[in-house]
């Protein structure tokens, strides 16, 4: 609220925290001499070319006009009170679950349709358009000084943002279970996680920071090409500068991607991969897994660390009319490649073990069997067709 503080009634924050003041109704310095916080307005007004004109407006404003303002203010206050008293006011409808975001409802309908059709690897939301990422545009290993500086600064911004969404209950981590499995790792690893929200990467960051590994191993993240090349604004900055590994439709860029992946894992760092490929908003079931994560691990002789996030409704109602989810992050035992098997055999075996672990966590946490509402029976592990 500090970015839009209305000068009316009780101010919602300390004066020194205010970023933007909004003078409303009978609290306008250009109409009244006794306005609260007017000194900030006049300090700014003095710096403009219309300062003298604003002063004339104040001097010429009549008591009759002020009386009319006060009456208008009283009417607005009464209207607000009448609305609050209504049984079917906006807030009550939202709390009763009768008024939910049209956008979210459409996404849920699309998820139900895609599940029925077995289209688990397809995204249900409009992603940014994908532009081909060129090799010269990406410094995967942050070898350049410019890349390192950008990453360091962006990480600080991201940390502030993460703290804020936790404080505002937009991200709620109820528990992290199994950090000892991450602590026990003695090499690089591919961390897998289900993908259901733009914030689940932040949840995994918190799990990583709760382990002893955060002081000696870096956490990288595989992301889609369009998120790196075309994602706008603040989130685009995070996508490009927070140890991300964007995939690419360019063959030469993918060679660079794979070489850098080998370097990261052999150096002893962690790579977060979403093997389901698609993101389905608040979808609780594990989806069929693609082979990419397990190929990275098997090729570099490092383990896969399966993580699965379960969800429960909190008592916090989001702006979209749905309850904010409380996350429990489950970190399972690492899955190691078998030195007696070929790479292809290890990819298949590790993928199937990961699928079994996620299925077990899902069924034990929710107390129900993993069943899909599909027109035809779907193999949970899925067909290993795509790289990630």
Locations of regions flagged by a protein language model:
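A glycosyltransferase accessory/donor-loop signature
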Residues: 1-97
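Residue-level preference for the first positions of well-ordered beta-strands
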Residues: 20, 188-190, 268-274
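Soluble, non-transmembrane catalytic domains of enzymes that act on hydrophobic metabolites at membranes
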Residues: 94-130
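Non-catalytic C-terminal accessory region of glycerolipid acyltransferases
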Residues: 99, 107-116, 255-388
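A transmembrane-helix-recognition feature enriched in membrane-embedded lipid enzymes
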Residues: 122-175, 233-241
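Helix-to-loop junction immediately C-terminal to a conserved catalytic motif
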Residues: 162-195
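Short gly/ser/thr-rich secondary-structure transition/capping motifs
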Residues: 170-177, 252-255, 310
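Catalytic core of membrane glycerolipid acyltransferases/transacylases, capturing the structured
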Residues: 183-251
């Amino acid at each position: 609220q500090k970015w839009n503080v209305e000068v009316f009634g009780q101010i919602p924050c300390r004066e020194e925290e205010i970023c933007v003041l909004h003078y409303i109704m009978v609290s306008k310095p250009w109409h009244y001499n006794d306005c609260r916080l007017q000194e900030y307005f006049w300090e700014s007004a003095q710096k403009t070319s219309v300062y003298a004109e604003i002063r004339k407006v104040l001097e010429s404003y009549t008591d009759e006009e002020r009386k009319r303002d006060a009456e208008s203010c009283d009417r607005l206050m009464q209207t607000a009170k009448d609305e609050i008293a209504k049984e079917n006011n906006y807030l009550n409808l939202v709390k009763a679950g009768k008024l939910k975001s049209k956008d979210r409802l459409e996404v849920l309908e699309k998820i139900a349709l895609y599940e029925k059709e077995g289209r688990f690897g397809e995204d249900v939301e409009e992603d940014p358009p994908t532009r081909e990422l060129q090799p010269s545009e990406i410094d995967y290993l942050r070898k350049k000084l410019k890349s390192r500086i950008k990453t360091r600064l962006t990480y600080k911004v991201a940390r502030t943002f993460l703290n804020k969404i936790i404080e505002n209950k937009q991200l709620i981590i109820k528990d992290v279970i199994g950090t000892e499995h991450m602590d026990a790792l003695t090499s690089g690893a591919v961390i897998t996680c289900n993908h259901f929200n733009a914030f689940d990467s932040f949840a995994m960051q918190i799990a990583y920071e709760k382990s002893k590994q955060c002081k000696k191993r870096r956490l990288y993240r595989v992301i889609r090409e369009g998120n790196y090349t075309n994602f706008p604004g603040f989130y685009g900055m995070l996508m490009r500068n927070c140890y991300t590994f964007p995939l690419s439709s360019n063959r030469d860029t993918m060679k660079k991607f794979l070489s850098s992946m080998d370097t990261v894992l052999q150096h002893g760092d962690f790579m977060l991969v979403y093997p389901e490929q698609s993101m389905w908003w608040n979808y609780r079931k594990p989806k069929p897994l693609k082979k990419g994560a397990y190929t990275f691990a098997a090729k570099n002789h490092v383990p896969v660390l399966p993580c699965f996030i379960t969800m429960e409704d909190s008592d916090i109602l989001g702006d979209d009319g749905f309850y904010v989810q409380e996350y429990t992050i489950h970190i399972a035992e690492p899955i190691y490649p078998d030195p007696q098997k070929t790479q292809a055999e290890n990819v298949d075996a590790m993928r199937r073990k990961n699928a079994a672990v996620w299925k077990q966590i899902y069924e034990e946490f929710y107390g129900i069997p993993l069943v899909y509402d599909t027109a035809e029976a779907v193999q949970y592990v899925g067909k290993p067709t795509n790289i990630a």
